[in-house]
Amino acid sequence: MNELTQTPPVADGNEPPFTRPGLVETWRERVSYQALSLGLVCALVAVALLLGNQLTHQRIVDAERQDRLAVLRQVLPQALYDNDPLADAFNVEDAELGLIEVYPARRAGQLTATAFQISTVGYGGPIVQFIALDSEGRILGVRVLSHKETPGLADKIEVTRSDWIKAFDGLSLASTPLDQWAVKKDGGQFDQFAGATITPRAIVKGVLRALEFQARQSTAQSNQETRP
């Protein structure tokens, strides 16, 4: 008697793919691998973005520091200090001016001059300026750190384009009457610009504020020293 032998059915390609032996496991492994790869790529991208932001932020901070240092060197004579005014800077909250950045210049431990960073409102927005005063309240120099004034009309506030801002050098509250701290159009002694009166007004206002702030600080210190 011949025994009948049965051969296993051969897949004809019409079976559902997930019913084939081993394909389910292979599919699961692929999905897990792809998910892991995607997660790894996302993590690497996040790290790269974070490092890039940190490097960019540091470059911006360094550039701002260099800008401040360059301006400070223009208004504070090197002979007046042996400290680092940038490193020794501090903020003061003033009732009239708000927050003021103060950069003290010292030589042999003694305060010889002070630079103030003050912001006033011009025609195009804030005008940030440095005003340096010696210990007697005389102006050592005034420079604009940043502004958004109209190009061409307000260029004179930049020392690289005009000597207008040097007109403040050597002045003080003691040497210049209060009513003269204005542009000529307003009865003061400082030139205005053709078509841009608001800009020089803002500069003069900032300088006067710095002078008055130092005067208030000096008066307060003197009162403390004379108290029993």
Curated annotation (Swiss-Prot):
InterPro entries hit by this protein: FMN-bd, Ion_transpt_RnfG/RsxG
UniProt GO BP: electron transport chain
Bilayer topology term: Single-pass membrane protein
Keyword Zinc found: no
A GO molecular-function descriptor: FMN binding
Subcellular location(s) of the protein: Cell inner membrane
Database matches in Pfam families: FMN_bind
Gene Ontology CC, one term: plasma membrane
EC assignment: 7.-.-.-
Top EC class for this record: translocase
Transmembrane segments: 35-55
Keywords: Cell inner membrane, Cell membrane, Electron transport, Flavoprotein, FMN, Membrane, Phosphoprotein, Translocase, Transmembrane, Transmembrane helix, Transport
Modified residues (FMN phosphoryl threonine): 197
Cofactor(s) of this protein: FMN
UniProt family annotation: Belongs to the RnfG family.
Record text on subunit structure and interactions: The complex is composed of six subunits: RnfA, RnfB, RnfC, RnfD, RnfE and RnfG.
UniProt protein name: Ion-translocating oxidoreductase complex subunit G
